């Protein structure tokens, strides 16, 4: 008979629906392990969407808003890796969610790293931008507000050192430059990169925001990401 053991994952629960007032809005945080908060303290609720939710509860104006975390470890915009790619799962994990009105898209580092080393999965900034534009259009076609989050620094990351190449930092910078100027595609920008980078070394996380692998933020880093979200973005109505 198999030995029973306790795990810190769940395999049969994909979401929880709650009854809310008719005017309650819904925010989906759509992303990769930085949205799922890989390497954060277990059960400490330090994901950046957790911090956004806490701030929304405390604000004195605006409609009630629920926050749904659709972060997926290993996720990429363009190609499948750990589960379906962002482009393939967007309908299911965002557009099909009940009550969704706003979306934050923070996705792309795993595209840049190409963990599997397949030549056909080596992507350019232009290819990533095309994918991000498609996500924005699909959300806006459904009447949703959609915001883009910049990609975090990763110089000298030790999580999987094979992913570190000088040209990949150039790709990150090119994507971030486009995001910051993408007023015609997204409805707003959340500059997560600027919130957690080391000003003296902009291609690195600030040490206090680094979990230790120079890629995933610490609890303080994830909370800082949540503080970087301008809540006034959610007060506009189409």
Where are these regions (language model features)?
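Alpha-helical scaffolding within the catalytic cores
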Residues: 11, 49-56, 82-98, 130-134
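N-terminal secretory targeting modules
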Residues: 1-30, 35-44, 61, 234-238
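C-terminal soluble interaction/assembly domains
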Residues: 110-114, 119-132, 140, 147, ...
